[in-house]
Amino acid sequence: MRGKFIVIEGLEGAGKSNAQRIVSETLAAHGIEFITTREPGGTPIAEALRNLWKEGEDGEHTTDKAEVLMIYAARIQLVETVIEPALASGKWVVGDRHNMSSQAYQGGGRGLAELVDEVGSAILGDFEPDFTIYLDIEPSIGLERARGRGALDRIEQLDIDFFHRTRERYVSLVKDNPKAVLINAEPAIEQVSADIQQAVEIFLTSEK
């Protein structure tokens, strides 16, 4: 039986790493074999593209449109070499970000929705997650949490309006996606973790 693809989405500081851990622990408790991935990244080539996108080269950074293409190049490399083979073998995949990130960040934040839709459709076709957990958080709260982890990266240093646009797009996407659920990521981590586990349990029940 083909595995299922569960994706964690959200702004910086929303708690995606914790969510991926909770989802993984819940699947393990049910005896489900799975792997975890992250985007951009997850393969040597995809990780190299991630580093190039985040760090640039000799002071040069990607333009907004080049960013879209680079992220989708990393994404399809991961899908074709890691995610699809795992799903085909019956393993589940728990991903830290997928296509909704591009729709929200590059489509909403960068204002390149049309390009993102065109590239995403051409690259991914009808491939999509079976279940998406979106962790919703007010941008200023998320960025404050991110600062607590250390220096902000190039994306995290963008103006707050960028993240408001990104969040607005996320909420719209989740509202229109019956395979996605919104979880308030602002309460204490114990509450958020419990909400995530409950969402996964409900999904597992629906798949029986």
From Swiss-Prot:
Query: Which molecular function GO terms apply here?
Result: ATP binding; dTMP kinase activity
Q: Which keywords has UniProt assigned to this entry?
A: ATP-binding, Kinase, Nucleotide biosynthesis, Nucleotide-binding, Transferase
Reaction(s) the record says it catalyses: dTMP + ATP = dTDP + ADP
Name the GO cellular-component terms: cytosol
The answer to keyword Cell wall biogenesis/degradation applying to this record is no
* Biological process, per Gene Ontology: dTDP biosynthetic process; dTTP biosynthetic process; dUDP biosynthetic process
- Give the domain of life: Bacteria
Alphabetized Gene3D superfamilies for the sequence = P-loop containing nucleotide triphosphate hydrolases (3.40.50.300)
The chain's coiled-coil residues are none
Q: Which residues are recorded as binding ATP?
A: 10-17
InterPro entries, per the entry: P-loop_NTPase, Thymidylate_kin-like_dom, Thymidylate_kin_CS, Thymidylate_kinase
| Signal sequence segment | none
EC assignment: the record states 2.7.4.9
Its job = Phosphorylation of dTMP to form dTDP in both de novo and salvage pathways of dTTP synthesis.
- Family of this protein: Belongs to the thymidylate kinase family.
The molecule here is called Thymidylate kinase
Q: Which organism is it from?
A: Glaesserella parasuis serovar 5 (strain SH0165) (Haemophilus parasuis)
Q: Give the encoding gene's name.
A: tmk
